[in-house]
Amino acid sequence: MAYPFQLGFQDATSPIMEELLHFHDHTLMIVFLISSLVLYIITLMLTTKLTHTSTMDAQEVETVWTILPAIILILIALPSLRILYMMDEVNNPSLTVKTMGHQWYWSYEYTDYEDLSFDSYMIPTSDLKPGELRLLEVDNRVVLPMEMTIRMLVSSEDVLHSWAVPSLGLKTDAIPGRLNQTTLMSTRPGLFYGQCSEICGSNHSFMPIVLELVPLEFFEKWSASML
């Protein structure tokens, strides 16, 4: 989860988020090298006393500064497209959960079970217990099994919302009349926090998301107790 004065990303909890972090580092390295080269050239131009006003044509230079940026863009685009297609893949999910956005709470339905659904509201600050996080705790957490592919169906009952959990690399728009889907898989147990990431009204900041990823045996006990 996030912490005060954090500069980087949250710790990756899913394979997709790990890929996104690697892509971020890959792109940042390219940008850093280009920026260093440009800064070096600018420094040379500002400090040198030599002038060259007779150059009218430089085809070699023009060829290089056309081909080189194209190669750099390809090196950025290929891994980006790979991750984009990975995020859209939904292959034989073990569990499907339907998420509906409301002003201003989330409702969840485990579609593989006959009657397992609930609403998830933020716990007011006055009702928090010691150790709980302000504006992030909910009365009903979304309990899911870890190390299993889970499909999330996301939509909205009223206005635009966005269901986002940064440590899992998830951000899916909840659009009225449209059903979007995404997949998640956690590589470790724990509590993972998110929030609505689309301005949806006066209480937009009070729509937290809490996922509790647990081993399968604990999930089965929880689901049995909820039915």
UniProtKB/Swiss-Prot annotation:
PROSITE patterns: COX2 (PS00078), COX2_CUA (PS50857), COX2_TM (PS50999). Binds a dinuclear copper A center per subunit. It is found in: Mitochondrion inner membrane. Its main location: mitochondrion. The chain crosses the membrane at residues 15-45, 60-87. GO terms for molecular function: copper ion binding; cytochrome-c oxidase activity. SUPFAM superfamilies: Cupredoxins, Cytochrome c oxidase subunit II-like, transmembrane region. GO terms for biological process: ATP synthesis coupled electron transport. NCBIfam families: CoxB. Component of the cytochrome c oxidase, the last enzyme in the mitochondrial electron transport chain which drives oxidative phosphorylation. The respiratory chain contains 3 multisubunit complexes succinate dehydrogenase (complex II, CII), ubiquinol-cytochrome c oxidoreductase (cytochrome b-c1 complex, complex III, CIII) and cytochrome c oxidase (complex IV, CIV), that cooperate to transfer electrons derived from NADH and succinate to molecular oxygen, creating an electrochemical gradient over the inner membrane that drives transmembrane transport and the ATP synthase. This is Cytochrome c oxidase subunit 2.
